[in-house]
Amino acid sequence: MLTFRSSILLQGPANTPELETLVVLVSIIANMTTLFAIAAFMERDPHTFDRLPGWLFCALIMAGLVVIDVAGRLGNDATMMALLVGGSVLTGVGYGYYWGSWAEYLGRMHPSRTSFYVPMAFLLTAALFLIISLSAEYESAPPLLLMLPLPVLSLVCLRRCHAEVPDGRYARTVDSKRYLTALASLVTLIVASLVLSLLFGLVWEMTVLSVGSVNEAHQAPLVANLVVAVCLIGLVLYAHKRLDLALAYRVIVPVIVILFAVLPFFWETSPVVLNAVMSACYGTFDVIIWYMVVSASYDFAVSGFVIGALVRGLSILARLLGIGIGYLLMLVP
């Protein structure tokens, strides 16, 4: 979620829907590239991840946030564009490492733990960014000062997870067959992810250009995500004693796919409301992806980073395509 919230740092001539979209696009491309690159090395040598300096990626994020914040204060368009792209790349690389790291550590934990941790993390993230957005808009708090502590806090949590002993068998040796088996178990989820990510990217970009601001387009969805997170946590607490959580998630996914296929036809009614509903649905699906990916990583004793990078990377590609289509559609009078 950090990837999409970096745009609140833009100010002055940089604070336009087009440049906000540019920051998001460059950042998630760098995010995806980092995920694929680290996963490629880890597939050959699982110990690669443990040798990566987490503090370096934290520093990249913080440096990128500062560069993006400074870019809008400059009058020179060429310099501003260079700083925006450079800052977005730095943050994207750091975010890619962070996302993969959480997939790696959660993949070492028993699914009974991750089924609660994942929606709880989603709840805390949505709450944090809603507070940051409202503070920046209504309290005139500097967005940069609100954003900078977050990568440090996340790194501290990652260090705490690194010190834990894995619950089950951990992937310390290379076994391509186990990776293929794990991915095969997620095929339907991956296909659904491609469809939903494309449609979400499409509606998100159309909403941003329609209301003229990424921040405005995100506030209602953040509230919707809070509601979704609370409902998912309630489902998890209920499911521990009453039903199979994985089965419940597999029932929820087709419902979300159908909603995503139908909702764009109601675009003219209210773009912001439609974006909020689709964001809530996508937030639900994002939690399901996290849970199923880390559960598969645990069950098949493979790296959560590698499996997560493949699933997440494909999702990002589909979202990029959706954003591109949405941008082109909004150019049509």
Segments predicted by a language model, with ranges:
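Helix-loop boundary and gating motifs at the non-cytosolic
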Residues: 1-33, 188-214, 290-291
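Central cavity-lining transmembrane alpha-helices of secondary-active solute carriers
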Residues: 21-45, 226-235
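Glycine-rich segments within core transmembrane alpha-helices of 12-TM secondary carriers
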Residues: 29-32, 111-136, 306-326
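C-terminal ends and interior cores of transmembrane alpha-helices
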Residues: 58-77, 252-268
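Hydrophobic core of transmembrane alpha-helices in multi-pass small-molecule transporters
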Residues: 77-98, 270-287
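Intracellular juxtamembrane helix-capping segments at the cytosolic ends
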Residues: 95-109, 284-301
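Intracellular loop-helix junctions on the cytosolic face of multi-pass helical membrane proteins
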Residues: 112-116, 126-213, 227-243
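C-terminal transmembrane helical hairpin of 12-TM major facilitator-type secondary transporters
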Residues: 243-286
